[in-house]
């Protein structure tokens, strides 16, 4: 899964730098307009990989070798107590991180932008839940190919456009 979504994450970081002129997150609060206005293709790519990162269908890959283990809990079947707790907490920390990146697309110098970003993050999270409940699993090969294709087209085109801007 990591090999599928990481190229888009790297392209997102490059696009944020090209659009804001800095890797400092505080710079987005100095912009005159939301950064999504210049890197909207990257945003679409990040939406695509967010489904992979949140482990939602169709990209919630099976991690166990036996069907009965997958029914129980997948790769966390043999975990319990503090170990399982740490895995679950870190999964939610990753969710907050990625949803925070979604919110960064909608921040600018206007204080209202924080409210706009929060509303959009909630809408995106509910979209992910809807996708999870309405699509069947795909094989890992399809996930890998489609994620790299989206990263190449959405991220690559947007980064190339910003390079010549």
Indicate where each model-derived feature is located.
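Alpha-helical transmembrane segments of multi-pass membrane proteins predominantly involved
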Residues: 1-165
